[in-house]
């Protein structure tokens, strides 16, 4: 299933600072979007020595590992296309670690991607792809 929404604007500041702000705000908007659609966010930016999971959430009995991809344009491809096979393997390994630390290894899990497309001075467009990989 795919859901889409449109949110406020982000200013067109310096490139490096803007990219960081875009990532931080994109993750915040993604979490809000998920919660508005009945998904419970458990953790944001969970870290271990091997990496980070953007959002860990639940939808009923299903644990969701959600990768957030935020971009200001599509010059380098759509945000949803930015999850490489290497990234998928890495996220799966991180999810196994997260589940193992909580003794939840037998539970149902799902991997979603939330795309935040946010051109300078324009509203953000958010798309949620359930079961992306």
UniProtKB/Swiss-Prot annotation:
Gene3D superfamilies given in the database record: 3.40.1350.10
Molecular function per GO: nucleic acid binding
Domain of life: Bacteria
CDD domains: PoNe_Nuclease (cd20736)
TM region(s), chain numbering: none
InterPro entries attached to this UniProt entry: Restrct_endonuc-II-like, tRNA_endonuc-like_dom_sf, UPF0102_YraN-like
NCBIfam families in the cross-refs: PRK12497.1-3 (NF009150), PRK12497.3-3 (NF009154), YraN family protein (TIGR00252)
Similarity comment text for this entry: Belongs to the UPF0102 family.
Name of this protein: UPF0102 protein SACE_6045
Lineage, broadest ranks: Bacteria, Bacillati, Actinomycetota, Actinomycetes, Pseudonocardiales
């Amino acid at each position: 299933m795919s859901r889409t929404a449109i949110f406020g604007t982000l200013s067109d500041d310096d490139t490096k600072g803007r990219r960081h702000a875009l990532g931080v705000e994109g993750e915040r908007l993604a979490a809000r979007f998920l919660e508005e659609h009945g998904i419970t966010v458990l953790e944001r930016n969970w870290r271990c020595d091997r990496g980070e999971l953007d959002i860990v959430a639940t939808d009923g009995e299903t644990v969701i590992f959600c990768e957030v991809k935020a971009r200001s344009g599509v010059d380098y491809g759509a945000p949803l296309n930015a999850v490489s096979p290497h990234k998928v393997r890495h996220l799966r390994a991180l999810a196994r670690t997260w589940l193992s630390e909580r003794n939840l290894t037998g539970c149902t899990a799902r991997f979603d991607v939330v795309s935040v497309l946010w051109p300078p001075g324009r509203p953000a467009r958010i798309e949620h792809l359930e079961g992306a990989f």
